[in-house]
Amino acid sequence: MATFTVIKMTHFSPLHIGTGKENYDFSASDLHSDTLLSALAAMRVQMGQTENLESFLSSFLLSSAFPFYENRYFLPKMQGKIKIVVKGKAESEYRKSLKKIHYIESELWQKLSRGETLELETIQQIQGDLLLKKEDGISVCKSQVSERVSVSRASEDAEPFFFDWKFFDRKAGLYCLTDAKGELLDEIIQLFILLGETGLGTDKNIGGGKFY
């Protein structure tokens, strides 16, 4: 059976993940593996290791980044309808809440992946886009939209726009999985350390997306 190492990214400064569009009023909820791999490749080049870049990137697997809270890990909701009921509630009372779920706590995810039906004790186990194994109101991150101004170099006209930052709880962050072992794993961890100092996402030049 394949084994994977968990790499945690903690103590994030405010983070904005681009959506591939020009608007900044919404930060993407997913940090995909190809984005992480590109960032690690950039760190490797920054360290002067420009040779064999393709062979390096193809020598290991790296997952997308998913949220965690302390030692509680979340995985993305699987495609298709998931079997979830809420004790004492009609489906019409919680259908909208189910549609908001984006990440599922790992123990519950494993049950759903086996085709089991989950019976929630309370609808409060759904917190925002998270499905929790117990009702304790944790929050991985909060979104804050602020107004900013862009000044064109050509016309010097000020154009306001909205920018969405994600603020992570101090006990929370993002994690990813890799199958790398030995010296290769050590190198990847060092690249993540450098990446944390540089930052992820948008506005790294003003301290955005830094982590430990």
Q: Could you describe each region identified by the protein language model?
A:
Residues 1-212:
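Conserved active-site/ligand-binding neighborhood in enzyme cores
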